A protein has these predicted regions:
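N-terminal "arm"/small-domain region of PLP-dependent enzymes with the aminotransferase-like
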Residues: 1-64, 72, 368
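Conserved PLP-enzyme active-site core in the AAT-like
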Residues: 2-4, 13-22, 83-283, 288
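Short, solvent-exposed beta-strand edge segments and adjacent coil->beta transition regions
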Residues: 54-56, 219, 307-311, 365-369
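Glycine-rich beta-alpha junction loops
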Residues: 18-20, 33-40, 211, 259, ...
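Conserved N-terminal alpha-helix of the aminotransferase class I/II PLP-enzyme fold
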Residues: 41-91, 116-123
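Short, well-ordered beta-strand elements within core beta-sheets of diverse protein domains
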Residues: 253-262, 310-318, 368-373
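PLP-dependent enzyme catalytic core of the Aspartate aminotransferase-like
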Residues: 122-123, 131-133, 144, 318, ...
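Conserved small-domain helix->loop->beta segment predominantly found in fold-type I
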Residues: 272-332, 336-341, 352-362, 392
Length: 394
């Protein structure tokens, strides 16, 4: 890693992952389009294959110089020991789970986890003989009662990307350590800038780099960051699955890192300004965003996080589903889409009840997930203002 500790975070991001030994070079790293690495001697070839999982040029699937730059940059920013890039966030989740779990094992999974993570445990892991217990994301020390003799890991997502519950990560890590359990967290919402998993003792951090890291909705990319203990098994799992990212996606990931700080500042600023306006509206029942004092998770967020991203939710007062759809169809700046983290603002009707096993999600008027993009906040508010009365049949 580079010795950039004397700099502030914005400068560290620009310098992250770079090999600055060369006197003359382009400011941007090249795109390496190649599958085969050639060697001049048998000794070089054998040495390369022996270390193929450890950021060594051996074969295209194991990475290129730009892949290694991306991985080193993310590890530096997030504070992990090492990172491995994957073809998507889902690939990162699968590779992590399969690296840690085997037939007969048991995992504790937060009930606020991403839907695909839930599906993986209910289908892929179940078919492999691995059992899952979902736990309430607001659980405290009571999680000890869910730990079995064959429990191997606790999977966290703080906050969840539909209902935004903040988990007490330090407490859960302490309990996990006492029981020799691996801790895995989905840190996509927190990003490497706003939440530092390894400072809090997490073993493995996963992110859908497709979202804030890439930041422009033009690449699919995932990344797994680890401590030293789990680096080797995570790398081998990801590489053996063949979940390698394409060279253009890696390039776009590196580009995204360089502007991550300034983009997140705008996302957070816009989200907070929109939320302050939404607080004044009689159509809104509750705002789901841990960075506001009214939220039940604010105390933990304020203690553990360094900022908040642009994704939040709102629950509506009782209204007709047809009116919700009518309002969404008329919005001009908020488009409907399943992803988030790009420059564009998005809005999506969601039903968290479909993704709950441990407790019910009872909200009469429906729930909307909103991503505040990089547009002017006043324009975004006006777009909502011009159409929100539809929810009251006006």
């Amino acid at each position: 890693m580079n010795n950039n500790n004397k700099y502030n975070k914005e400068t560290k991001i620009i310098l992250s992952g770079k090999n600055n030994n060369s006197k003359n070079s382009f400011v941007n790293s090249p795109i390496y389009k190649g599958s085969t690495v050639i060697f001049k001697t048998v000794k070089e070839m054998n040495a390369s294959m022996k270390n193929k999982h450890m950021q060594t040029l051996a074969y295209g699937r194991y990475g290129s110089p730009s892949t290694f730059e991306f991985e080193k940059a993310i590890a530096e920013i997030e504070g992990g020991y090492s990172a491995v890039a994957t073809s998507s966030g889902t690939a990162a989740i699968v590779a992590s789970l399969l690296a840690i779990l085997k037939t007969g094992d048991h995992i504790l999974l937060t009930d606020s986890a991403y839907g695909i993570t839930r599906n993986l445990t209910k289908n892929l892991l179940k078919n492999m003989g691995i059992s899952t217990t979902f736990y309430n994301p607001n659980i405290g020390i009571e999680i000890q009662g869910l730990i079995k003799k064959n429990t191997k890991a606790i999977f966290l997502e703080s906050p969840g990307s539909l209902t935004f519950e903040i988990q007490d990560v330090p407490m859960l890590v302490e309990i996990a350590n006492k029981n020799n359990l691996v801790t895995i967290i989905d840190n996509t919402w927190g990003t490497p800038l706003f939440f530092k998993p390894f400072y809090h003792g997490i073993d493995i951090s996963i992110q859908s780099a497709t979202k804030y890291i890439v930041g422009h909705s033009d690449a699919m990319l995932g990344v797994i960051i680890t401590n030293k203990k789990y680096e080797k098994c995570i790398r081998e799992s990801a590489h053996n699955m063949g979940s390698c990212p394409g060279p253009e996606d890696i390039y776009l990931g590196i580009r995204g890192i360089k502007t991550l700080s300034i983009r997140l500042e705008r996302h957070q600023k816009n989200a907070l300004k929109i939320i302050e306006w939404l607080k004044t509206r009689k159509e809104i029942d509750k705002i789901l965003y841990p960075a506001i004092p009214e939220n039940s998770g604010y105390k933990i967020w304020n203690r553990d996080f360094l900022g908040a991203s642009g994704l939040f939710g709102v629950t509506l007062k009782k209204t007709k589903k047809s009116l919700i759809h009518q309002m969404l169809n008329k919005l001009q700046l908020f488009n409907m889409g399943y992803s988030w983290g790009g420059y564009e603002s998005l809005i999506l009707p969601v039903n968290p009840e479909k993704y709950r096993d441990t407790y019910q999600w009872e909200k009469e008027g429906g729930t909307l997930r909103i991503h505040a993009g990089l547009e002017n906040a006043d324009d975004l508010i006006n777009d909502l203002k011009e159409n929100i009365n539809i929810l009251r049949g006006i």
